[in-house]
UniProtKB/Swiss-Prot annotation:
Similarity annotation: Belongs to the nucleotide-sugar transporter family. CMP-Sialate:CMP antiporter (TC 2.A.7.12) subfamily.
One cellular component (GO) term of this entry: Golgi membrane
Transmembrane segments: 42-62, 76-96, 149-169, 173-193, 202-222, 246-266, 283-303, 324-344
Keywords attached to this entry: Golgi apparatus, Membrane, Sugar transport, Transmembrane, Transmembrane helix, Transport
Lumenal compartment residues: 63-75, 170-172, 223-245, 304-323
GO molecular function, one term: sialic acid transmembrane transporter activity
Role according to the record: Sugar transporter involved in the transport of CMP-sialic acid from the cytoplasm into the Golgi.
Membrane topology classification: Multi-pass membrane protein
Pfam family, one: Nuc_sug_transp
Protein name: CMP-sialic acid transporter 2
Highest taxon of source: Eukaryota
Length: 406
């Protein structure tokens, strides 16, 4: 049995296995359920560590970019420059990959390859547009919350992503994994609890309403973008990731440039200077955002969106400590308790015990399907053997099964 195909041990002919069912194109077609190799584990560790560093630094760099609580630059210009940096990286890596192609492989830089890949990856325009909206919201969220709180709120994306993965990509989660996600929400809620002193209960309604709206969009939009991005990258798995990134970042640059044009129309030609108000901190912010986006593409294609979001929760500790050390933000007991529950949730979600029952049920279902398929094929072969004297054999998923007597 290989890739849902049953192979005969004599003639090497292949047929689609009756028990193979396409649950999800993006997961099943590319061996998503195979045992994780040592190289895959090393890649996952590298992705998680890199993501923790980059995601943890982002809100700190955004906070450092503010002057008197405001941005002297246009956030859209930062997003546009970030996309340009990622496009340049994708082009350089694509040229490097093309120079090291093996003999007989289809050239990556040919016009036909580029056009065909562009047609097959048009779906990447959807997450690119959603990311353009989300990148602007990252700056807006800093006006309402401190960096550590922004990271805790972003953890809400895990639950939304899980629901979207179940709806769009038909991915299944065990009961223990759903309970782990519930624990994650509890941990985030504990962190958000604040005891206000007397006389401090009045909050400006426009600011509070704007914060809630931004939080809802901040959680929903990137979650939808991540799921569509993972589906688009995995559905065209044979396409070079750097070629896919070139399309994704190209779409993102176009959307952000349209945002700049809209700003020019609204504020006047003076706002067209995309470098206005930038500082050394914003340059580091652009490089950090570019590296984070590039790393995310490897998460979505070779790892998992849930792993990506859970790894971002680890960055909360780094963000909280850094914001406390650099900006004097206080690490409350609620924050420490919330972080503890988040880590318990992460351990429970990825624990082998959380997957054992689900995998056992799947194995039983596959075994029953295989037995039913074998009985059906046995009946058909016996009928054919009684009607003809010609040699015949049956194709089984197990090559050790002997051929029928002639």
């Amino acid at each position: 049995m290989k890739n849902g195909m049953a192979e005969c041990s004599v003639c090497r002919s292949r047929l689609v296995s009756p028990s193979s069912k396409a649950i999800s194109r993006a997961y099943d077609n590319y061996n998503y359920k195979i045992r994780v190799s040592s190289k895959q584990r090393a890649l996952n560790v590298f992705l998680v560590v890199g993501d923790c560093m980059l995601v943890g630094l982002q809100p700190v760099l955004v906070y450092m970019s503010k002057v008197d609580g405001k941005f002297n630059f246009s956030p859209i210009s930062v997003n546009f420059l970030t996309e340009i940096a990622k496009v340049i990286f994708a082009m350089v890596m694509l040229l490097f990959q093309a120079r090291h192609q093996k003999v007989g492989e289809k050239p990556l830089l040919s016009l036909s390859t580029f056009v065909q890949a562009a047609r097959n990856n048009m779906l990447l325009a959807v997450p690119a547009g959603l990311y353009a909206i989300n990148n602007y919201l990252k700056f807006t969220m800093q006006l309402y919350f401190n960096p550590a709180t922004v990271k805790m709120l972003s953890n809400l994306k895990v639950l939304v992503i899980a629901v979207l993965l179940k709806m769009i990509m038909k991915r299944r989660f065990s009961i223990i994994q759903w309970e782990a996600l519930a624990l994650l929400l509890i941990g985030i809620s504990i962190n958000q609890l604040r005891s206000l002193p007397e006389g401090a209960t009045t909050v400006a309604v426009p600011i509070a309403t704007g914060a809630y709206i931004c939080t809802f969009i901040f959680v929903t939009v990137p979650s939808l973008a991540s799921v569509y991005n993972e589906y688009a990258l995995k559905s065209q798995y044979d396409t070079s990731i750097y070629l896919q990134n070139l399309f994704l970042y190209g779409y993102g640059a176009i959307f952000n440039f349209l945002g700049i044009l809209g700003t020019v129309i609204y504020k006047g030609p003076g706002s067209f200077d995309i470098l206005q108000g930038h500082s050394r901190a914003t340059m580091f912010l652009i490089l950090n955002n570019a590296a984070q986006g590039i790393l995310s593409s490897f998460f979505f294609k070779y790892a998992d969106t849930i792993l990506k979001k859970y790894s971002s929760t680890v960055a909360t500790i780094f963000t909280g400590i850094a914001s406390a050390a650099l900006f004097g933000h206080i690490l409350t007991m609620n924050f420490l308790l919330g972080i503890s529950i988040v880590f318990i949730s992460m351990h429970q979600f990825f624990s082998p015990l959380s997957k054992a029952k689900d995998e056992q049920q799947n194995g039983n279902i596959e075994l029953v399907d295989a037995k039913d398929g074998h009985r059906a094929k046995d009946s058909f072969i016996n009928m054919a053997a009684g009607a003809t004297e010609e040699a015949s054999h049956r194709i089984e998923s197990d090559d050790r099964v002997p051929l029928l007597p002639r």
